[in-house]
Amino acid sequence: MTATEEPNRCRIVLIAPRIDDPAKLKSLISAAAEGGDVASLILPAYGDGETAFQHRAETLVPVAQAHGIAVMIEDDTRIAGRVGADGIHFEGRKNGLEELIEKFQGRMMIGTGGAKNRDDALELGEARPDYMFFGRFGYDNTPSPHPRNLSLGGWWAEMIELPCIVMAGNEIASVEAVAATGAEFVALSSAIFAEGEDPAAQIAAANVLLHAKAARFEAGE
């Protein structure tokens, strides 16, 4: 899907799963990318050392970018630069985010997460990142999105101009609840990559639901 064909409604952000086998992970991401519209892919570090994390990023970034999917690397600017990623996803305090934005915004996208309440989110938002993420990597282990993430996403989407991403649950149908908040993006991981699932079919199904249920945004929103 080209930029001119991007849908004007809530879109999918993939969170790469915690899988140690690079070949298997590459196959899963490639299959998901074939399933339909995906806006971006976030690569969490999952506690890996620098060498292992960089190898994973080197494996996945070209696959995603070949399908027009922007790739965000969690926290490590050196790895992001080495592998030609599109941006950094930062989980931390406002001062760290401000420093990151000062150094890299303009060259890379800078997104953030980790807010547990409205005050946290507003403090991080003052740094003007490219997006706010509500949720935690690896915690999409229930069918529905976490109520706190839905609440924060709905409040943010209504009150703040910066785009937000809300973590969905481990069932595809949960994208509807996220889209209903007005969030610009819905994050999916276990719903796509669970053992036995077809990532392409799951992405296609999620896009069908979003196309049918998600509100349309006005131009410029």
Enumerate the language-model features and the residues they cover.
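Glycine-rich anion-binding loop/nest that anchors nucleotide
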Residues: 133, 164-170, 187
